[in-house]
């Protein structure tokens, strides 16, 4: 179920049985597997790759730009596996260098 109050970019790829709550944000270039739950105000930014069975709580941000002076704006990834719980206001940034991931 995707709330009509959530933003999901039309190019984002969502698996089966994904719940996206109101005010969640899912950017372009995002891939989400099956059985995930994205809570209100969570943000999955460009470069997010998420497996199955995860829960992302309020205010968490995944695949934000790296907080590293070496980052030059390259396309990098944040890869989240299966069956994780990402709690409130956690920040998981993307890799810093081209072809890298966290």
Please describe what each predicted stretch is:
Residues 1-4:
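Extreme N-terminal starter segment of soluble prokaryotic enzymes
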Residues 6, 12, 17-20, 24, ...:
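A structural motif detector for beta-strand N-caps
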Residues 65-75:
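Short, flexible, glycine-rich and Lys/Arg-enriched loop motifs at helix boundaries
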Residues 73, 100-101:
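Disorder-to-helix initiation segments
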Residues 94-98:
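Beta-rich strand-turn-strand
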